[in-house]
Amino acid sequence: LTPEQKKVYEQMKKAAIAVLNGKVTTTMTVLTQLMRLHQITCGYVAADDGTTQQVESNRLNELMSVLEDTDGKVIIWANYQMSVSEIMQALTKKYGANSFVHYYGLTPQEDRQDYIRKFQNDPECRFIIGTPQTGGYGITLTQANTVIYYSNGYDLEKRLQSEDRAHRIGQKKTVTYIDLIAEDTIDEKIVEALRKKINIASEV
């Protein structure tokens, strides 16, 4: 985390504890507080009115550094639409607009199959960026040999389904999975639970 992120994260953590100590908690209340902390690790602060404010973050730089050391085609999963937009801007700047396609909530329905075909068949298209909520189900992305989780949600099924996009019939390569994690934050807890096949939503 950057110094600014650490400051905001600790403030939000104290606020979350106060909220959880001050009322009868529901699963949704707990998950909301967890995801607010998680958003800070990704560079955003979410307000009660639904607006978001950016906080200086190293995560995008870390992603670009990982991509420099990665060969072949790559699936990049992000939990938030704002992250997808940021990643697309960074890829356009470094690799060009033809280097990627996207598959998330703002991707037009009529373009989605064309984008999958482009990723699978066009050598110039190295990256597909999406959210597990939208792109994690039912599509085949077997040309990828690397899957990067820019950020994770707490839903185990979405994680497992998104992992399987590169492991469909026709995959002949070994697939490498990479999680970007902010140390000493909720990030570590989320990824640890997902790797242990624990559905956080059902454990709260």
Report the location of each language-model feature.
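Conserved Helicase C-terminal RecA-like lobe
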Residues: 1-139
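Alpha-helical scaffold elements adjacent to nucleotide-binding pockets in ATP/GTP-utilizing enzyme cores
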Residues: 8-12, 115, 143, 161-162, ...
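Short, histidine-centered active-site or binding-site loop motifs used for metal coordination
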Residues: 41-44, 145, 181
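SF2 helicase motor core recognition
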Residues: 84-88, 112-113, 126-174
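A conserved SF2-helicase RecA2
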Residues: 154-204
